Amino acid sequence: MRSHYCGDVNKSHVGQEVTLVGWVNRSRDLGGVVFLDLRDREGIVQVVYDPDLPEVFDVASTLRSEFCVQIKGLVRARPDSQINADMRTGEVEILGLELTILNSSAPLPINMDKNQHNTEEQRLKYRYLDLRRPEMADRIVFRSKVTSAVRRFLDGNGFLDIETPILTKATPEGARDYLVPSRTYKGQFFALPQSPQLFKQLLMMSGFDRYYQIVKCFRDEDLRADRQPEFTQIDIETSFMSSDQVMAKTEEMVRGLFQELLNVDLGEFPKMTFEEAMRRFGSDKPDLRNPLELIDVADIVKEVEFAVFNGPANDPEGRVAVLSIPGGAKLSRKQLDEYAKYVTIYGAKGLAWMKVNDLDKGMEGIQSPVLKFLSEDVVKALLERTGAQTGDLILFGADKANIVAESMGALRLKAGEDFDLLQGEWKPLWVVDFPMFERTSDGGLHAMHHPFTAPSNMTPEELEANPIAAISDAYDMVLNGCELGGGSVRIHDSKMQSAVFRILGINDEEATEKFGFLLEALRYGTPPHAGLAFGLDRIIMLMTGASSIRDVMAFPKTTTAACPLTNAPGFANPVQLAELGVSVVEAETKDSETKDAE
C-alpha cells in the first residue's frame, strides 16, 4: 500500500512518484490550495492538493485530523523561502495526484498537538491515540532500536537468549509478589517473578555460561515516576567471569548504545566505593553533574556550646556535614525556611545556615541564627574547610549519620537544580564495595542487594562471626543520579548460601522449604558465576529525556497500578473463582472498623 514511510521522503526522491499511507496530522486551506501534513511512525511530510485536479482536491477539502488515508503524488523541492528546517522532510513536499480515505475519525477525545495539555488519565485511556503523537512514537521506535542493539551486542559476544518461567514460586526479593492461584492445586499459588534471579543462576549450573534475556518482571509495590508494577529488564548472567570482567563487558555494551544511538562518547566509567559515595554525596547513586559535596565538620564543632552540633559531633553514630552553595547568600529567609522544611521529609529535625555576606569583614560579614554559639576560630575553620566565598551559603546537617546522608544528599540535588549548577550532560560511574547487610528497624539484618550475593574474600565462618562488617562483591552502574543496573558475584557454595540464610533469620527448615532446589543444585559442581540486570525502561527514559518511564512504555499503568484503557484490574467471574477455590472477602468499611474499635 506504500512505497515509502512519510518521514523518509527527502531531496533524493525529487521527481519520483511515491505512495504513502498514514494519518492526517493537520489540514489547512490556504488561498484555495489544501496543505496536508501526513504522519506515520517515521515522521511527517507535507502534501499539497491543487484545485487544478478538482476531483482529488474536493476529497482533500473534506479531511480532518486523524483520518487514515493513502496518497499518491510527485515529490518536489520546496522553494528556499519555504524550507522548514525543523522537519526531517522540510526540504521537500509532495504534489498530491491521488487520495483515498481508508477510514474517517470521530471527534478526538484528546488533544494531539504537543503544545496542548492532556491529563495522564486521558493519555492512558486513549493510549492508541497518544502513541500516534510524534514525541511518543519516536520514543517507542527508539526503544526498539535499543533492544535491537542490545541483542546484537550480546549475541555477538556469545550470550544465549534463554527464556525463564513466568509462573514460578514466591521468593523474598524485597517487594510484594503478584500471586496467581492454581486451579489444579487448590489453595496454592504461583508468583509472577520479580526477577529471573534464581533461574538464571540455575542456567549457569546447567552449563550455559553466557545468558541474557529481555524479560518482564513484576513487583507489587508503591509506585512513583520511575516504577511500574510490570517492567522490563536486560538480564545478564555469566560463568567464570570476575566482577571486573562483568563490569567491563556491560560497560562496553552501554557505551556502544550511547555511541550508536545518540552519538555520545561516555568515556571510561570511574569507580567509587559505596562508603565514598555516601560520604561525599549522601547517596549510593550520586549525580556527578552536580559539583556540590557534603563536607564533614564534626571535628570543628564538637566543642561548641550548641547541642544541635556538639551532640552528633560526639556521637559515634552521628555526623555533622555541610553544603557550601555558591551564590546562595541571596536566598531569602522564606526560601531558607522552605529548605528547612524540605529536609524534614528525609528525617532531619531542621536546617542551620550561615550566609557569607562579606568575607573581608570577618565576623561582621557573617549572618547566621546560630552565630552566637560559634567562636571566631570555629567560623574561620568552617570557611577554610568549605572554601566559601563572599555571597555563598553554608547549610548544616547534624544528626545520625544515615539521616544526615539522606537529608543532605536530597538537599544537594535540590540546590543543584535550584542554582543551575549541573555540569555536563552525561556522568556515568560504577559504585562498588557495598555492605553485604544493613540493619533493619527491629535490629535484625537484611541483604542490601539480595540473599544470593557473595561476600568479598570471606569464609562462611568469618561471615557468620561478623556479618555487619562484610563487604559484598556487588556493583551498580549509575548515570546522572539514576541506577541503570545492578549486579554481583553470586554465591556458588552451599555452605556459604546456608550461612547467609541463617544471618537473615531464615532457619534450615524455612530455607529448605523456599530454596531447597537451589541448595540442592549448589551441591553438584556449581561454577563461579556473576551477573547484572539493567532496567530497560529507565535507560530509555534517560536516553530520550522523558520525565517518567510511563512515557517510554507502550501501555503502562497509572501510579495506582491501574489501566484506564482496559479498566484493569477488574472483578473475576464467580464461576472462575469457584474453579480456583478462591473466595472474595469484602473489605470492612471505616464505619465498621470504628464500631469494632469502640
UniProtKB/Swiss-Prot annotation:
Region: Aspartate; residue ranges are 197-200
Question: Which residues participate in L-aspartate binding?
Answer: 173, 219, 449, 490
| Cross-referenced InterPro entries | Aa-tRNA-synt_II, aa-tRNA-synth_II, aa-tRNA-synth_II/BPL/LPL, Asp-tRNA-ligase_1, Asp-tRNA-ligase_1_N, Asp/Asn-tRNA-synth_IIb, AspRS_core, GAD-like_sf
- EC class name: ligase
Q: Does the keyword Ligase apply?
A: yes
According to UniProt, the reaction catalysed is: tRNA(Asp) + L-aspartate + ATP = L-aspartyl-tRNA(Asp) + AMP + diphosphate
- Give its localization: Cytoplasm
Q: Which Gene3D superfamilies match?
A: Bira Bifunctional Protein, Domain 2, GAD-like domain, Nucleic acid-binding proteins
Q: Which residues bind ATP?
A: 219-221, 228, 483, 535-538
Kindly state which keywords UniProt assigns to this record, in alphabetical order: Aminoacyl-tRNA synthetase, ATP-binding, Cytoplasm, Ligase, Nucleotide-binding, Protein biosynthesis
**Keyword Acetylation part of the UniProt annotation:** no
SUPFAM superfamilies, per database record? Class II aaRS and biotin synthetases (SSF55681), GAD domain-like (SSF55261), Nucleic acid-binding proteins (SSF50249)
Name the GO cellular-component terms. cytoplasm
GO MF: aspartate-tRNA ligase activity; ATP binding; nucleic acid binding
Documented EC number(s): 6.1.1.12
What is the purpose of this protein? Catalyzes the attachment of L-aspartate to tRNA(Asp) in a two-step reaction: L-aspartate is first activated by ATP to form Asp-AMP and then transferred to the acceptor end of tRNA(Asp).
Q: Fetch the HAMAP family from UniProt.
A: Asp_tRNA_synth_type1 (MF_00044)
Quote the NCBIfam families the UniProt record gives: aspS_bact (TIGR00459), PRK00476.1 (NF001750)
How is the subunit organization of this protein annotated in UniProt? Homodimer.
The record's similarity note reads: Belongs to the class-II aminoacyl-tRNA synthetase family. Type 1 subfamily.
What protein name does the entry list? Answer: Aspartate--tRNA ligase
Q: Which organism is it from?
A: Shewanella halifaxensis (strain HAW-EB4)
From the UniProt record, report the name of the gene that encodes this protein: aspS
